[in-house]
Amino acid sequence: TTPKGMWTATMERGNIDPTFDACKLIGAAGASFVARETMIDPKKLERTLVKALEHKGFSYLEVFSNCHVNLGRKNKMSSATANLEWIDSISLAKTKFDMLEESQKEGKYPTGVLKQDENALEYCEAYEKVKEAHKNKTMVEL
């Protein structure tokens, strides 16, 4: 996703669409595990990926990765390192993000596990309840 005002090969004149937080969108849509990491700390990314895969239910993991060929080069980030430095400047651990004033949060993205609901009913389990209710000609009880 290209941030508003930046340009790439597919957004030659710059992105005019508002930047939005995909993790907030997915969390609001009902995902029971939502996380974000960056390529800057591969070990942390790996640990979070394992958590996402082990989580029972819908998991979403957003990874901020450098795109030095298109996004970086076209937006005055002359190297892969410069692109990673930009990613580092807009991301910070959720615990630190939560301590910021609202005005300081604009343009920043928290990293780590952002939502984890271990008690959420997993979709396939819910569907089994629908099938059982259909078989018994009753209303589904969730």
Please report, for each region that a protein language model flagged, where it lies by residue:
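Short, surface-exposed, charged loop/turn segments at secondary-structure junctions
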Residues: 1-6, 42, 49-54, 72-85, ...
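Flexible, low-complexity linker and terminal segments
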Residues: 67-142
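Conserved thiamine diphosphate
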Residues: 4-51
